[in-house]
Amino acid sequence: MKVIMTTKIDKASMNIREKLIENFGFTESNLTFDGNRVYEKEDILILTTNEEMIYYDYLDKEIEKQTKIKPEVIVFASRHSSAKKLPSLTTHVTGNWGKAMYGGKDESFAIAFPSAMKLALLKMHELNDLGWTVCYEATHHGPSELEVPSLFIEIGSSEEEWVNDRAGEIIAETIMYVLKKREKFKVALGIGGGHYAPKQTKVALESDLAFSHILPKYAQPVKKEVILRALSRSTEEVEAIYVDWKGSRGETRQLAKELANELGLEFIKD
């Protein structure tokens, strides 16, 4: 079963949940999760917790424990917060390049689902009649301790956007599209740029490249073994290392080049 994860303490999450139930024919099941009724449609479940999702390590195990169902994939429907309050529709995988400041474990990564994130990006871009920014975010926050592929799809970045009905509809439709469609793309690990990964976003929207984990400039430098770990945490094989050259530190550029040669991966310099 495929799982859409929501939380009661997140207004964007509840907005998206409401639109999923209203617009896509989800019905109450006889299951509960964390004391909340589970909704279902075909092979998709909507689960709701009462906690912050970013701190929910081992969620896949908890879902199996409470529902007796092993999830194939988890899509987190969430808010995105930023001081700049940029109206945005974003997607990313979770994990920590260094210290775990907001959930997860240090230097640990969830399993990326590159094709799903790319499909989410393309669908949000197509549906975006709000004029908001549509983008990847770099890999950040928890949960990192999950053994099934997962991704966050978010409404940002302030309460005004979180409760916007149209944004809720766009994300609900995007989630359903991602869970129903299967498409394969060439996969790259992304290195460089700011938190909103502008170059990686542009490349994903305009070419056949999909990204797994994205290492932003602010998280550099990182150790070789951390990049190797990120490379291994993808449900689809990573074939390339993509570097936003100006948006990366010198030592990280060099390390990326060396790793690509060592592992026989394509090196893409942008």
From Swiss-Prot:
GO terms for molecular function: D-aminoacyl-tRNA deacylase activity; zinc ion binding. Belongs to the DtdA deacylase family. Keywords: Hydrolase, Metal-binding, Zinc. Its cofactor is Zn(2+). InterPro entries: Deacylase_DtdA_archaea (IPR018033), DtdA (IPR007508). Monomer. It comes from Pyrococcus furiosus (strain ATCC 43587 / DSM 3638 / JCM 8422 / Vc1). It comes from the Archaea. SUPFAM superfamilies: AF0625-like. One of its GO terms (biological process) is D-amino acid catabolic process. The gene is dtdA. Binds 2 Zn(2+) ions per subunit. It catalyses: a D-aminoacyl-tRNA + H2O = a tRNA + a D-alpha-amino acid + H(+); glycyl-tRNA(Ala) + H2O = tRNA(Ala) + glycine + H(+). It is an enzyme of class 3 (hydrolase). Its EC number is 3.1.1.96. Transmembrane segments: none annotated. D-aminoacyl-tRNA deacylase with broad substrate specificity. By recycling D-aminoacyl-tRNA to D-amino acids and free tRNA molecules, this enzyme counteracts the toxicity associated with the formation of D-aminoacyl-tRNA entities in vivo. This is D-aminoacyl-tRNA deacylase.
